[in-house]
Amino acid sequence: MVVQKSVVRSRVFGELEVSEENIIFFEEGIPAFENLKKFVIVKEDQSPFYWLQSVEDKDIAFVIINPFEIKPDYEFDLPDEIVNKLEITSAEDVAVFCIVVIPEDVKQTRVNLKAPVIINVNKRKGMQYLLDDERYPLRYYLFENLNSNVQK
């Protein structure tokens, strides 16, 4: 089997060589970026952060994090409609990430726990899903919450 590779240009990483099998298709795009459908995940070395890099626009890359690393009790149920749309057949198919906003004052770094990015890693399909759950804020202040969790 021949694996197709292509070069993805990225403002953050320069040129990335990406296997077609690593490209994740977002049928509806990401809210506010609905025209962008193809993304690749790039891991930061020695960091809990990843990048969700658009394959179609070098200037669009989101910092993402596995929410379970910062909030071990994070949990939610996906409705059947989403499970079917992403063709999920087992929990092992699913990777969950949350978008991180890192402002100039890094102490104000926040994570969007309200709208996780759900990825079927086997089918390479993804979407950002808005949870109907008041436990999770749009702006979860990372350092403030990490400090309070350490003090407990």
UniProtKB/Swiss-Prot annotation:
Gene Ontology CC entries for this record: cytoplasm
Keywords: Bacterial flagellum biogenesis, Chaperone, Cytoplasm, Translation regulation
Pfam families: FliW (PF02623)
InterPro entries: Flagellar_assembly_factor_FliW, Flagellar_assmbl_FliW_dom_sf
Biological process, per Gene Ontology: bacterial-type flagellum assembly; regulation of translation
Location within or outside the cell: Cytoplasm
Main location per the UniProt record: cytoplasm
Keyword check for Ribosomal protein: no
Cross-referenced HAMAP family: FliW
Family classification: Belongs to the FliW family.
Main function: Acts as an anti-CsrA protein, binds CsrA and prevents it from repressing translation of its target genes, one of which is flagellin. Binds to flagellin and participates in the assembly of the flagellum.
Complexes and interactors: Interacts with translational regulator CsrA and flagellin(s).
Protein's recorded name: Flagellar assembly factor FliW
Species, as recorded: Caldicellulosiruptor saccharolyticus (strain ATCC 43494 / DSM 8903 / Tp8T 6331)
